Each structure stands twice: as structure tokens, then as C-alpha cells.
């Protein structure tokens, strides 16, 4: 252990759990289950200027500054990852989140999971259209295309129509 993290011992000893003698200096702060990471999920940064939700299909692990969530089993047949990402990254949901989020600098917001998990999600007759457009956005991005504004515009209009705004 000393060979790998010994040079960080003083810094690690300053963690709250070490000061309270709940953990030894070389122990992880919080244990993690591999299965949580090794699955399809939506990932997003802890701090951001705007909503930046992305689908992870590569079983990625992340640092403390990246959070993720997955669709609970009882909702897997109701909502798709593509639909959720399309909704969450929309202009409407970006504004909606910023109204409720903690601002941490002039333009940055705190995307702490307790706030993100309270975001209301709807499903109506525009579901399939939003999902299809979101899939097109993802395909363009996978192909290295950066111009997705036409698709985002359509998604935003569908969401506004669904919400009556």
C-alpha cells in the first residue's frame, strides 16, 4: 500500500472518516458495488453550466465528480434511456432544473443526485417522436457529427407541446 498511496497519507488522513476513526487512512471512503457500474446507465457531471446527461453502454466507472443512475426494473418497459436523455438534455428541462438547482458559481450548477432524482418525467403521445429524435441525436454524435440543433429544436417543440408551454 505504501508503494502506491503512501505519498498521499497525510492528505488521506484529513478525510472526515479518518479523523473520526471510522476508516483507516488507506481505506476507500465508501465502498461501491461493481454491478452498479457494469450496466447500462445515464451519467452526468456533478457540476455543469447546463444539463449534460449521456448514456453509458460501456460499463464505465467514474470519479467522484461524475454521477449515474439506471432505470429501475419496474420502469424498463415504460421509459427508454434514449427518451430520458432527450428529455433531460432539452432546453425546457435545462431551465426547469436550473430553477430548482443550487447555483455554485456565476453560471455553474450543482447536479447532486438528490436534486436530479426529483426531476419529474412525463410520458404522453409524443413519447415515440421524442425517443426517435433522441436516437437520431445519439447516432449523429456517434458518427462524429456535431450539428444536432435541428433535432434538438424538434425535441424542444414536442416537449413544449406536451407540457402546454
Identify the residue ranges that each predicted region occupies.
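Polybasic, glycine- and aromatic-enriched phosphate-binding surface used to engage nucleic acids
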Residues: 1-128
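Non-catalytic DNA-recognition/assembly elements of restriction-modification systems
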Residues: 123-165
Amino acid at each position: 500500500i505504501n508503494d502506491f498511496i503512501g505519498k498521499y497519507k497525510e492528505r488521506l488522513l484529513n478525510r472526515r472518516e479518518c479523523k473520526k476513526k471510522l476508516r483507516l487512512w488507506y481505506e476507500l471512503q465508501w465502498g461501491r458495488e461493481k454491478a452498479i457500474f457494469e450496466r447500462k446507465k445515464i451519467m452526468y457531471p456533478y457540476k455543469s453550466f447546463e444539463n449534460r446527461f449521456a448514456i453509458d453502454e460501456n460499463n464505465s466507472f467514474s470519479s467522484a465528480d461524475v454521477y449515474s443512475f439506471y432505470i429501475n426494473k419496474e420502469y424498463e418497459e415504460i421509459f427508454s434511456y434514449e427518451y430520458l436523455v432527450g428529455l433531460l438534455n432539452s432546453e425546457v428541462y435545462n431551465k426547469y432544473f436550473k430553477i430548482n438547482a443550487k447555483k455554485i458559481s456565476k453560471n455553474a450548477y450543482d447536479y447532486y443526485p438528490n436534486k436530479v432524482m426529483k426531476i419529474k418525467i412525463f410520458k404522453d403521445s409524443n413519447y415515440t417522436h421524442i425517443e426517435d429524435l433522441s436516437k437520431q441525436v445519439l447516432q449523429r454524435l456517434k458518427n462524429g457529427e456535431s450539428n444536432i440543433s435541428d433535432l434538438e429544436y424538434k425535441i424542444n417543440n414536442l416537449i413544449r407541446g406536451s407540457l402546454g408551454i
